[in-house]
Amino acid sequence: MEAGPWRVSAPPSGPPQFPAVVPGPSLEVARAHMLALGPQQLLAQDEEGDTLLHLFAARGLRWAAYAAAEVLQVYRRLDIREHKGKTPLLVAAAANQPLIVEDLLNLGAEPNAADHQGRSVLHVAATYGLPGVLLAVLNSGVQVDLEARDFEGLTPLHTAILALNVAMRPSDLCPRVLSTQARDRLDCVHMLLQMGANHTSQEIKSNKTVLHLAVQAANPTLVQLLLELPRGDLRTFVNMKAHGNTALHMAAALPPGPAQEAIVRHLLAAGADPTLRNLENEQPVHLLRPGPGPEGLRQLLKRSRVAPPGLSS
């Protein structure tokens, strides 16, 4: 880990000064340095609200962070916030420091603390595609709110889906061709689901589920993943409405092409009901764009409307 001594001078009365040389080969050495600094220096905040613990966490200095956190824990300041509302835990998460995240949680950091945007440690991991941070939260064994909402009304799972949509190219029809960034974000989706995130939760602004968000982004890989989840009533899930529109309505309104066709077929196979109408009294078939491209889907949706219910399950 970190190497070399930490030169310590008398504790200043002003903001914390990050040492020119940091500790140390072991936790014991780091503890000795923190003892020499004293609580006044460790509790001090700079002009941006950062403590030394925030700085250690951001730089991945595990033993220094652990030793500093032990001191702040004694003074019940382990969740001290910098100017953007980030606790040391949130800083460690954003810096992709899973070991420090797990250490802070084990020392008693508030797992559901949120910054000034309402983002928890799960939201941060989901936003940046950091499966290691999610694994650290899971390994810590702490109870964390998987349905916490940020100030946009999004759960961590909604956030992970949106982040994955951004990272995936329209041509990414198969997980085998995903970029490293997209793969990490897909792993976050998998992990949140495994941790128990509710895939039927609707975001607050427009009532979209993660399925609506995946369809809206023309992401057939993600649509298929969500439709293969083992728990819950699949037919009810696939027919949930967002401001009157089912996922099938949204799929029908997509630009024509292979992604649209794959999504429509996935939805129909999962029990999507093409007879449902939105607030404008439209069925999905009415939302297909004109032209020869969608004609096959037009016929498919019309046939599905008269097929026995058992054939679409």
Swiss-Prot record:
Subcellular location field: Nucleus
GO cellular component terms attached to this protein's record: nucleus
Primary localization: nucleus
Disulfide bridge positions per record: none
SUPFAM superfamilies referenced in this protein's UniProt entry, alphabetically: Ankyrin repeat
Pfam family, one: Ank_2
Keywords assigned: ANK repeat, Inflammatory response, Nucleus, Repeat
GO terms of biological process kind: inflammatory response; positive regulation of T-helper 17 cell differentiation; regulation of gene expression; T cell receptor signaling pathway
SMART domains: ANK
ANK repeat start-end pairs: 48-83, 84-113, 117-146, 152-201, 206-236, 243-276
Coiled coil (residue ranges): none
Record function comment: Regulates the expression of IL-2, IL-6, and other cytokines through regulation on NF-kappa-B activity. Functions in the regulation of inflammatory responses. Involved in the induction of T helper 17 cells (Th17) differentiation upon recognition of antigen by T cell antigen receptor (TCR). May also regulate TCR-induced negative selection of thymocytes.
Record family assignment: Belongs to the NF-kappa-B inhibitor family.
Record's subunit section: Interacts with NFKB1, RELA and RELB; in the nucleus.
Name by which UniProt lists this protein: NF-kappa-B inhibitor delta
Record gene name: NFKBID
